[in-house]
């Protein structure tokens, strides 16, 4: 996976600890470690070659003893999935599901890089995970998502039909406000609304225009800001897999509509436009 160059550089630094959250990210975590170990072995070979005639037992031992600092820094103490919970009950669950492994991170010294399988709403991160990681007092926290930014409803799987449920969408809306381009949202709304009575085969997904002015990094930075819990001062970064990286990692699974907005059926375009119209009318027309 092409996830994070800075995280990969951490394989050469003794002050970076890698972990995963939640339990469903375990497979992605081991895949990440495999990639890091391959990269580290390549670096070891190059460092040994550079020694040339100056090789000594001590230098060779130092190079060969380099390891990825992999720790199970967080774990679920009860078998619960907060993803499918509703409203306040979800927040209550998220706040109590996880515990940490003390001593796995050197306070104020180590960077903590944790991989998540996906960050959709951001509830678990904000209400639980970041607070728990902050109790370890790392120098910085980097949350790496093995999936790209989930920007659109699925409609073929889990029922999340409201655009405002997605942290990526909320971040894009906030960026419109910050940059003084909120009027774009009304244009998108008018385009979506004009298509409501068209046959689904003629509908274009104009919701994709919500993200057009911003890079993925812009949205990730805004998400990190929005998901920072009150009272947490540790530096926080969120890094997402790219869509290109996803296709490279999973070449035989081309479906990416919840990331790209390219729905496999016309009905998807129609439904996502309806979802944006509902969001806009509830958020702006009622003011």
Go through each PLM region and give its residues.
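PRPP-associated nucleotide enzymes
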Residues: 1-287
């Amino acid at each position: 996976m092409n996830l994070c160059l800075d995280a990969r550089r951490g394989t050469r630094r003794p002050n970076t600890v890698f972990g995963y959250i939640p339990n469903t990210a375990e497979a992605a975590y081991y895949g990440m470690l495999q990639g890091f170990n391959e990269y580290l072995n390549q670096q070891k070979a190059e460092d040994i070659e550079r020694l040339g005639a100056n090789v000594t037992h001590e230098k060779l031992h130092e190079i060969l003893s380099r390891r990825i600092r992999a720790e199970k820094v967080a774990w679920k103490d009860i078998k619960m999935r907060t993803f499918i919970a509703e409203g306040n009950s979800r927040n209550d669950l998220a706040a109590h599901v996880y515990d940490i492994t003390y001593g796995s991170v050197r306070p104020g010294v180590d960077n903590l890089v944790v991989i998540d399988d996906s960050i959709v709403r951001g509830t678990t991160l904000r209400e639980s995970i970041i607070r728990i990681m902050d109790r370890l007092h790392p120098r910085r926290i980097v949350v790496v998502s093995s999936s790209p930014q989930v920007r659109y409803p699925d409609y073929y799987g889990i029922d999340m039909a409201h655009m405002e449920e997605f942290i990526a969408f909320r971040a894009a809306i906030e960026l419109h406000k910050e940059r003084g381009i909120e009027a774009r949202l009304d244009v998108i709304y008018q385009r979506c609304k004009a298509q409501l009575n068209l046959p689904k085969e003629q509908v274009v997904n104009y919701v994709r225009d919500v993200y057009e002015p911003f890079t993925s990094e812009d949205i990730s930075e805004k998400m990190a800001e929005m998901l920072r819990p009150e009272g947490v001062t540790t530096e926080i970064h969120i890094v997402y897999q790219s869509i290109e990286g996803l296709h490279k990692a999973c070449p035989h699974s081309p479906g990416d509509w919840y990331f790209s907005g390219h729905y496999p059926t016309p009905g998807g375009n129609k439904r996502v436009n309806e979802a944006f119209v509902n969001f806009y009318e509830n958020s702006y027309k009622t003011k």
